[in-house]
Design a protein with these regions (language model features):
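Structural/interface elements that position substrates and couple domains in central-metabolism enzymes
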Residues: 1-140
Length: 140
């Protein structure tokens, strides 16, 4: 993923409330050490943006070893940024960033409104005309 390009696209929206769907480096894992989304989140926080992060596989209580040490160093206040549901991310965000190909994300972004922007970093399978939000991709 082009982290800088994703960062630039998000900043260019001028929006302040950013939702991240998917935080681990790939769907179905809780490993954050190889995740470019962690780096992106750090950059967005550095710009003072408000983040709401959802990844059903990432739970601070379950993180152990090197994975736990890594995230505590990179984003020590992660617990305050985690949302418990996808709907919470959709409801609270002006920009919704899709960071991995978890199957439920393709359906979830259909709930986004015309006022919201969806930035898809992974090229989800789409439902085309059903999507109401401003849909943007990266590198495809």
């Amino acid at each position: 993923m082009q982290i800088q390009q994703a960062f630039d696209q998000i900043i260019e929206t001028g929006k302040k409330r950013i939702g991240l769907l998917g935080f681990s480096f790939k769907a179905g894992t809780d490993d954050l050490r190889e995740s470019p989304i962690v780096i992106l989140a750090e950059q967005l926080l550095g710009k003072g943006l408000k983040l709401c992060i959802y990844d059903k596989n990432v739970s601070l209580a379950r993180l152990v070893g090197a994975n736990k040490e890594y995230i505590e160093k990179q984003i020590p206040h992660l617990s305050s940024l985690l949302c418990t549901t996808i709907d919470e991310v959709i409801d609270q965000s002006e920009v919704i960033v899709v960071g991995n190909q978890t199957p439920e994300f393709a359906e979830a972004i259909l709930k986004a409104t015309p006022e919201q922007i969806v930035i898809d970093l992974v090229r989800l399978p789409m439902y085309g005309s059903l999507l109401k939000a401003d849909y943007r991709g990266i590198c495809w």
